[in-house]
């Protein structure tokens, strides 16, 4: 089982190489598009990405409710049941991996939420989908951190080792707490709360982006766009 899971994780990481493909006519790689969108003065892309996260979660929840029930024998000898598959197949891993790749491109698209939803849409059990999403994210996040530090070191501005370490540690702590929160949401069957949260946040973000576009002013800083 462990060897199979390791193989599925390796397959799930393969789509990340798509991020290094060149985008025709731009002179940039696919991963650079995300940095461009995240650093621009508008937030409408983030708003739509949050709504996409919400839509994926709602679809995943619906698919999970209709997933096949599997029976198993518990340690006490009694028969238990679980909704959805616990084993990943190659197509499942590729689907989740491509979704993770999309989350790396679109700022605002929740990596954990979207990859978990992809697993649910493939008929995977909620807990299994969450565990796979978590483990799949570890090498991806570490690789992103290494690339970010590498790019920062290459910049002419001296950021400082202390500042970089503080940034990495903060990101790791926040990511850990976010995963713990998502695990609690899944174990207490409150995944819909996360879906509604991203829905409301997405709507608010789009409203703010429209107001900023009309006024030409950043609502939070008061500076012109």
Outline where the language-model segments fall.
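Multi-pass membrane proteins that catalyze or facilitate reactions on polyprenyl-/lipid-phosphate substrates
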Residues: 1-106, 113-225
């Amino acid at each position: 089982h462990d060897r199979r899971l390791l193989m599925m994780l390796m397959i799930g990481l393969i789509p990340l190489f798509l991020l290094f493909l060149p985008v025709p006519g731009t002179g940039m790689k696919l991963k650079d598009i995300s940095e461009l969108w995240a650093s621009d003065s508008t937030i409408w892309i983030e708003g739509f990405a949050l709504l996409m996260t919400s839509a994926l979660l709602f679809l995943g929840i619906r698919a999970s409710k209709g997933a096949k029930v599997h029976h198993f024998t518990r340690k006490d000898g009694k028969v238990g049941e679980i909704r959805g598959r616990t084993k990943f197949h190659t197509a499942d891993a590729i689907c989740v991996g491509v979704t993770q790749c999309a989350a790396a491109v679109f700022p605002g698209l929740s990596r954990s939420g979207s990859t978990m939803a992809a697993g649910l849409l493939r008929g995977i059990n909620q807990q299994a989908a969450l565990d796979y999403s978590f483990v799949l994210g570890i090498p991806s996040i570490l690789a992103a951190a290494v690339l970010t530090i590498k790019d920062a070191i290459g910049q002419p501005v001296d950021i400082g080792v202390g500042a970089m370490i503080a940034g990495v540690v903060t990101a790791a702590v926040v990511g850990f707490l976010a995963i713990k929160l998502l695990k609690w949401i899944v174990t207490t069957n409150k995944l819909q709360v996360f879906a509604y949260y991203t829905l409301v946040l997405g709507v608010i973000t789009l409203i703010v982006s429209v107001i900023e576009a009309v006024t030409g002013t950043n609502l939070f800083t008061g500076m012109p766009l």
